[in-house]
């Protein structure tokens, strides 16, 4: 029930991060509890729908992620989210994933009509010993992620054809959120 002017959203379990879907009433949420799910939340009526994993998920592997072994639905545990805005209601979603594998999972978001749908397109497995927290889309087709560690964490960058590289000078205590600018 609402508390004054503040409505509650029921459904997503342990939402860790949220991203709005451009030009739509939808917000995507990462629910990290137990196996974990990705949810679509309708900002108009505050209802939510599980998008991934489901029994009928779709995949269309992208050659840029050829080192990824394919989709793994169990032990998903999504954490940080970033959305690369596309055109005509199609976007790219980057998801920090824990559980069965530590990786950035990549999905195509189709928000052209009705509830958005996700198509898994690939993943970039984390370097050995790295546990990601936050992810951000970079200009071009790359992305960056924080390795949350104490006393010293760092920033990692992934680019097609090159894979992961540690960003020099990015070491700090417990890096968490991350956002990039268009330039």
Enumerate the language-model features and the residues they cover.
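Beta-strand-rich domains and repeat architectures in extracellular enzymes and scaffolds
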Residues: 5-38
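Surface loop/turn motifs at the tips and blade-to-blade linkers of beta-strand repeat domains
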Residues: 7-12, 52-54, 70-73, 123-128, ...
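A short helix->beta-strand "capping" segment at the edge of beta-propeller domains
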Residues: 1-14, 62-64, 118
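Blade-loop segments of beta-propeller domains
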Residues: 37-87
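Short loop/turn segments immediately following beta-strands, especially the blade-tip
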Residues: 41-44, 107-116
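Residue-level detector of Asp-centered blade-edge/turn motifs that repeat once per structural unit
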Residues: 21-24, 84-89, 137-140, 181-183
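Beta-rich catalytic cores
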Residues: 14, 34, 77, 100, ...
């Amino acid at each position: 029930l609402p508390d004054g002017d503040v409505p509650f959203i029921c459904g997503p379990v342990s939402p860790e991060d949220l991203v709005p879907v451009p030009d739509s009433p939808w917000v995507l949420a990462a629910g990290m509890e137990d196996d974990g799910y990705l949810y679509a939340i309708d900002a108009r009526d505050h209802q939510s729908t599980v998008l991934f994993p489901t029994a009928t998920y779709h995949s269309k592997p992208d050659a840029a992620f050829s080192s990824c072994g394919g989709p793994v639905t169990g032990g998903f545990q999504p954490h940080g989210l970033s959305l690369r805005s596309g055109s005509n209601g199609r976007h790219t979603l980057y998801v920090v994933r824990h559980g069965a594998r530590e990786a950035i999972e990549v999905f195509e978001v189709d928000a052209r009509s009705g509830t958005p749908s996700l198509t898994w397109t690939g993943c970039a497995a984390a370097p050995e010993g790295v546990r990601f927290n936050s992810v951000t889309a970079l200009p071009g087709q790359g992305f960056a992620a924080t390795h949350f560690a104490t006393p010293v964490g760092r920033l990692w960058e992934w680019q097609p054809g090159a894979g992961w590289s540690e960003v020099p000078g990015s070491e700090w205590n417990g890096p968490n959120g991350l956002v990039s600018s268009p330039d």
